[in-house]
Amino acid sequence: MSPQTETKARVGFKAGVKDYRLTYYTPDYQPKDTDILAAFRMTPQPGVPPEEAGAAVAAESSTGTWTTVWTDGLTSLDRYKGRCYDIEPVPGEENQYIAYIAYPLDLFEEGSVTNLFTSIVGNVFGFKALRALRLEDLRIPPAYVKTFQGPPHGIQVERDKLNKYGRGLLGCTIKPKLGLSAKNYGRAVYECLRGGLDFTKDDENVNSQPFMRWRDRFLFVAEAIYKSQAETGEIKGHYLNATAATAEAMMQRAECAKDLGVPIIMHDYLTGGFTANTSLSHYCRDNGLLLHIHRAMHAVIDRQRNHGITFRVLAKALRLSGGDHLHSGTVVGKLEGEREVTLGFVDLMRDDYIEKDRSRGIYFTQDWVSLPGTMPVASGGIHVWHMPALVEIFGDDACLQFGGGTLGHPWGNAPGAAANRVALEACTQARNEGRDLAREGGDVIRAACKWSPELAAACEVWKEIKFEFETIDTL
């Protein structure tokens, strides 16, 4: 160290433990258009003021550490630090606060969801001053959005590839999800696709197990796709899960799918990781493959009301990283999803511009600056009686996925698929005629049963099935 540097450091440096409020709590700060904004739900430890807790979150997720260090004098902390610029109590909750934090854009690597999450949530959730912490929402500025490719193709390009317009898409997860041989698996795929579905799907934990190696599955499924296309005259697809133990193996599976000429593959983006997902998304765009994304493991992260990361943040991250489909919850069925919150997820996935709306959990206005949209996928315990509600809630730009609601049909897979297709088209036609599906949906389904024995049989089987549990994440 030169004498000049040593003297300067000694003059400006005073050792000691930091009071975060002095540096990182800045209530007069006006966020810039280029700042990344975060809304954290904090539960401070007893005796910790919310201002200190909010400042600590800003510090530990940006430039701060627990003590003063002499190297602070070698850069401009004022330029790079996160700032807690507002704190508000959570109505009806004791000792919970929403802390709003602004991060300068220079803190983040361009086009990297991995770096974004490592910075904002990578370390601060273990901070002792907090009993619990939840990332409620992020505002991604247009300047940062533009550094991402986003979904490989998006909703409109997908419809053009499939030549399917004016209705939602239908899918089905093959069951049992584990244990079938590759040939029997392909047979189940064929029956569903020839019956009227647009897609079938690998379950999220179908990779390359001893009972069915991935290459065998890919070959038999491709045969099923081509055979069903020849019979129906429609383009068909199956979400071939490319998730693997290594990124290299994942890309090998994606390349095999491309060589087979199938239209779509699949990835488990949370268990597989954002870096792998972004690489796969780039490959899919370059090679004309659609990319279906499963959110396996999401409830570990997003289900608790006061700790973790909300799914709206995970959905934004996926739209940046890249995926043409993403499971979003259903509102109806067996898996959790409160209506307004779920619709907030759906809008963030599909729309170009979403206004702030706290009633739906949206803390910031989000401008995606024409980044391609991601199609929401509704799945989990749904059947033909849910179809009117699903069409009314999700509209046309969604994939409605009936697993047991297809394969559980008393006459087999193909009749189960036909029942779902008839129900979807009947509900879509009724909506287009101006009928209120919320009130008349049951009548629409019953009328369609008169000319579809497959639908009538399905309605009889599932007429009493309900999943009535209170949702956890309500606003």
Curated annotation (Swiss-Prot):
Signal peptide interval: none
Binding site for Mg(2+): K201, D203, E204
Binding sites annotated in the UniProt record for substrate: N123, T173, K177, R295, H327, S379
EC number: 4.1.1.39
Alphabetically ordered keywords of this record: Acetylation, Calvin cycle, Carbon dioxide fixation, Chloroplast, Lyase, Magnesium, Metal-binding, Methylation, Monooxygenase, Oxidoreductase, Photorespiration, Photosynthesis, Plastid
Subcellular location as annotated: Plastid, Chloroplast
Enzyme type, top EC level: lyase
NCBIfam families tied to this protein: PRK04208.1 (NF003252)
Annotated protein name in UniProt: Ribulose bisphosphate carboxylase large chain
The encoding gene: rbcL
